[in-house]
Design a protein with these regions (language model features):
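Single-stranded nucleic acid-binding surfaces, predominantly the OB-fold ssDNA-binding core
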Residues: 4-203
Length: 203
């Protein structure tokens, strides 16, 4: 969910931008146990779910990908509060002959906290390139919205593909941008739970 965005001209210095072009911080309550994801050179990485409250009293469930070297993954931490800093990442998971884009926050630093007081629980900054024609539309209630797929460069020639949503004047602005445009955006990470209609009577 994008709150502010900016169009950038010119190239990007990869050595300076590898970490700076994708920054996120979330704070909330752990609501799951750890689920093994993968191992790199003997270091295990695990998924855990964090519930992050919005100002509107609803909440988002954000998957964290965390190293066993940052937290004791053999114990349950359900009900504890955590602040995590890292990068929002994506990968394609092949399941039932379909590709599914999996999004998670790759945690670089974390801290257990006593409460959410004076915390800004959900912020993200991305600097990347539009890799699909933006889709601008109006909702049935008259709200302007634009879908943007952003490619954010990572080290070793990899990229993360992050679907973003803009509202209002940001939606109008983003709807006129072309593929290959470099933009910077500030916003929040949002879980997208929706019902998809697959037939006349089925959702």
């Amino acid at each position: 969910h994008i709150q502010n965005l900016r169009y950038i001209q010119g190239g990007v210095n990869m050595t300076e931008k590898i970490l700076k072009n994708n920054q996120a911080v979330v704070a909330g309550e752990i609501i799951s146990d750890f689920e093994f994801s993968h191992e790199v050179f003997g270091e295990g990485f695990y998924f855990v779910k964090l519930r992050v409250n919005r100002l509107s009293h609803s909440s988002d469930t954000i998957p964290l990908l965390v190293s066993e070297r940052l937290i004791d993954v053999t114990h349950s931490h359900i009900g504890q509060y955590l602040e995590a800093h890292g990068q929002f990442r994506s990968y394609n998971k092949h399941e039932n002959n379909k590709n599914h884009l999996v999004l998670s926050l790759f945690v670089r630093e974390l801290e257990f906290i006593d409460s959410m007081e004076n915390r800004k629980p959900n912020m993200i900054f991305l600097d990347g390139y539009i890799c699909k024609e933006p889709v601008y539309r109006t909702t049935p209630l008259g709200r302007e919205i634009a879908d943007v797929l952003l490619a954010v460069n990572r080290a070793y020639g990899k990229s993360d593909y992050i679907p973003c949503i803009c509202w209002g004047r940001n939606a109008r602005y983003a709807g006129n941008l072309s593929v290959g445009s470099r933009i910077q955006l500030w916003g929040r990470i949002q879980s997208r739970e929706y019902q998809k209609r697959v037939g006349e009577n089925n959702v």
